[in-house]
Amino acid sequence: MRQHRIVLLPGDGIGPEITAVAKLLLDALGHQHGFKLNFEQHPIGGVAIDASGSPLPASTLEACQASDAVLLAAIGSPRFDALPREQRPETGLLSLRAGLKLFANLRPVTILPALIDASSLKANVIKGVDLMVVRELTGGIYFGQPKGRIEADGDERAFNTMTYSRTEVDRIAKVAFELARDRSGKLCSVDKANVLDVSQLWRDRVDALAANYGDVELSHMYVDNAAMQLVRNPRQFDVLLTGNLFGDILSDEAAMLTGSIGMLPSASLGSEGPGLFEPVHGSAPDIAGQDLANPMAMVLCAAMMLRIGLKENDAARALEGSVERVLAAGFRTGDLMSEGCTQLGCAEMGEQLLQAL
């Protein structure tokens, strides 16, 4: 029997509730599809600060590094807002990404038929949308040097540096090309090569790598046009590749095509070692412990983990199918409620998903 070592990081807020749902379904899928998941649970974020004083204990990082995949629920609590930034729960996530050497962030955006009316865009615009934003996570203007604020000539000036190396562009582009090859074979690289030198290097390297992927149709688009096209005609896209700053903005824009942040998973990958799979939503401390959380994003993270991290494609498809069937049957958590639907709590939604498997 195939065995996989999984680290669960429930974290803060609603994290434990949605983690319990994901684990329930993953255990069932293992029995159905002939594999066993060996789970370890470790603290991160606010709960880790409470227990050990650190948002990422060394034991948590070591367990993650030794795993096959990491499933993280949520990090953050207003209780820690008064702490210096480097001591807050969120720094645990940044340290985890660094410790796992993750550089590629994947954000899928899929419009499910049962939720098409949840979007603020017209149904005829978003029907059939199924795209993936691939964002470079560790370079670009967020990390470039020099940066800072200075006083000079009686004025104050602030500056940041947008920089990418050939190596950084090549490794993220390879991730996007491979994803496009496994999907519809279409890749759109987003840059600002008409203005920025760094984008000209980006485009040159993506073009150079395209020679190795003759089965992938490559196009380029300036970021301002891409932002417009995501709203005007999102169906034209399959895989979108872009840098850290542009990807930060475009992935949030694309996410809102769905109409609910409670349905959005993500993955962060490195060249080797385990991937990190986490919902886009936060820890929602205002509803924590009340059985009100929507577990769907966490469940879809589990599906991404099965497909990308563990290569258990049949189980991933089964889990995604259960989500579609439960929504089609009219079951909703409070954040997705609409007329004629049946409202469920987090645990009840988990039971419905289990039955739908």
Swiss-Prot record:
EC number in record: 1.1.1.85
Binding-site residues for Mg(2+), renumbered to this chain: D224, D248, D252
Classification via Pfam families: Iso_dh (PF00180)
Cofactor(s) required, per the database record: Mg(2+); Mn(2+)
Keywords: Amino-acid biosynthesis, Branched-chain amino acid biosynthesis, Cytoplasm, Leucine biosynthesis, Magnesium, Manganese, Metal-binding, NAD, Oxidoreductase
Pathway: Amino-acid biosynthesis; L-leucine biosynthesis; L-leucine from 3-methyl-2-oxobutanoate: step 3/4
Source species, domain of life: Bacteria
Localization per Swiss-Prot or TrEMBL: Cytoplasm
Site, Important for catalysis: residue positions: Y142, K192
Swiss-Prot/TrEMBL catalytic activity: (2R,3S)-3-isopropylmalate + NAD(+) = 4-methyl-2-oxopentanoate + CO2 + NADH
InterPro entries for this protein: IsoCit/isopropylmalate_DH_CS (IPR019818), IsoPropMal-DH-like_dom (IPR024084), Isopropylmalate_DH (IPR004429)
GO molecular function ontology, one term from the record: NAD binding
Sequence positions that bind NAD(+): G282, S283, A284, P285, D286, I287, A288, G289, Q290, D291, L292, A293, N294
Keyword Transmembrane recorded: no
Binding residue positions for substrate: R97, R107, R135, D224
Cofactor binding, per record: Binds 1 Mg(2+) or Mn(2+) ion per subunit.
Single biological process term from Gene Ontology: L-leucine biosynthetic process
Single GO cellular component term: cytosol
NCBIfam families, per the entry: leuB
HAMAP family with a match to the protein in the record: LeuB_type1
Similarity-based family: Belongs to the isocitrate and isopropylmalate dehydrogenases family. LeuB type 1 subfamily.
Protein's UniProt name: 3-isopropylmalate dehydrogenase
